[in-house]
Amino acid sequence: DPEIEEILSLKSPRTAIEKRIADLSYGIKLNQLVYDRARDGKPISLFSVRKAPELNKLFYGKDINKFIEEYERLESLNLYTSQIDARDFLKMFAMEKTETSSYYVVNIDEMNTNTSYLDEISQSNICVEFMTPTLALSSSEKDHPAIGICVLGNINMSEVSIDELPAVTKFMVETQTMLALRQNHPTSQANAFVRGYRDIGIGISNQANWVAKLGYKYGEPEVLNTLDEWMEHFAYGLISASNELVDTFGVAPLFHKTNWKTTMPLDRYNKNVDSICSRKPSLDWDELRD
């Protein structure tokens, strides 16, 4: 966005009061191109969506290479509004985030590739925990799942052992699903989303305490294999429990709009993890595919 520098400063205490929006929290969407330009010491070009509508569309797509190709084509034609040094931009963002504590960053290319949704995602909830496809509301499509709904739960990692994970994850999935299906949201589009996808998000907390109980300091590489083992059992338990819900509720109506039939998290994780974690998967993931 050509106004990104002004947008970043809108919450700053140094900004004039008449322009400040202290009560509004929002996120900034980036993709790999920004980081690559910063690494290489190059500028980023700022385009208006009016002059580059196709670029804006590709920004939310699932193929960043197509975005970069169009981006560089428009750059070669000098169609950008202005340019800013990529490193200066990231420094400015980091400074404003540090001072205001209310900016959230969304890596939109990662959001659209490391996801189970087949439709493109353009936004998330404010704290970037839950990313779903959304559409502009239309009164003529009252039953269209246009509003993403967060149905979130949490497991205290330091209080649950690997042996307890199957029972705990099963309980969490069943409880959150039941709660979701009992909810009645103000709009039919939100209800259509919840009932169509039956999506829930289960996270973890207290990882630092879990690490301390093992006798390590947070961030030490020695704990990574143990963490990987715990997280594999955590993910496996959640997906296994979700499969069992089919016996109760049947297949989710919008299951066909996801890639769960062919793709597991194990298939799409960032392979750079293999350079810091030597452990290999130990559970029967193929059984879940069936």
Q: PLM ranges: what are they?
A:
Residues 9, 13, 18, 22-100, ...:
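Polar, glycine-rich mid-to-C-terminal structural blocks
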Residues 169-191, 216-290:
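Internal maturation/activation junctions in enzymes
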Residues 96-194, 204-211:
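Function-dense linear segments that define catalytic or interfacial modules
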Residues 2, 19-25, 46-52, 104-111, ...:
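Short coil/turn segments at secondary-structure boundaries
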